[in-house]
């Protein structure tokens, strides 16, 4: 719990700092070429722990979503396709308005980080066991 609180405090400070900065191109010893800090007001994110077999309902994101397996093993599915699995460090981008679900594999938990690029999330029906296990 202390780790989560520390991450939220540090993360909140970084987000606040990024919002406070005005985009300005310039020279920076950490970059080569012109690099500009951009506004991130529409970007949101989250971190979730899924127990083995846990998953989201079907849903879509108006402007897409990036999901990342921080630890454990992740399973994802898109409407009309079989599932895919990713080890820790793996990620998947889901384009705008593509119906999908994601969560842990049947035998392994998952810590997932997700990033949305603005817009609404449209929640649909629960992902059935048959859909979750469809190859």
Residue spans for each PLM region:
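Ligand-binding loop in jelly-roll beta-barrel domains
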Residues: 96-121
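Conserved short histidine dyad/triad with adjacent acidic residue
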Residues: 44-61, 96
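Short loop/turn positions at the edges of beta-strands in beta-sheet-rich folds
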Residues: 52, 70, 80, 96, ...
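A short, N-terminal "cap"/entry segment at the start of jelly-roll beta-barrel domains
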Residues: 2-47, 57, 85, 122-135
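Short, conserved beta-strand element in jelly-roll/cupin
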Residues: 49-50, 61-76, 115
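Short histidine-centered beta-strand/loop micro-motifs
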Residues: 56-61, 78, 85, 103-105
């Amino acid at each position: 719990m202390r780790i989560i609180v520390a991450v939220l405090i540090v993360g909140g400070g970084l987000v606040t700092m990024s919002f406070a900065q005005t985009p300005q191109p310039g020279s920076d010893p950490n970059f080569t070429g012109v690099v500009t800090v951009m506004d991130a007001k529409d970007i949101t994110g989250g971190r979730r722990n899924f127990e083995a077999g846990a998953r989201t309902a079907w849903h879509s994101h108006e402007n897409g979503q990036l999901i990342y397996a921080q630890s454990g093993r992740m399973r994802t599915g898109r409407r009309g396709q079989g599932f895919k699995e990713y080890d820790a460090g793996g990620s998947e981008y889901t384009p705008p308005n593509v119906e999908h679900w994601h969560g842990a594999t049947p035998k392994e938990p998952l810590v997932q980080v997700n990033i949305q690029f603005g817009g609404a999330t449209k929640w649909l029906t629960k992902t059935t066991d048959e859909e979750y296990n469809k190859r």
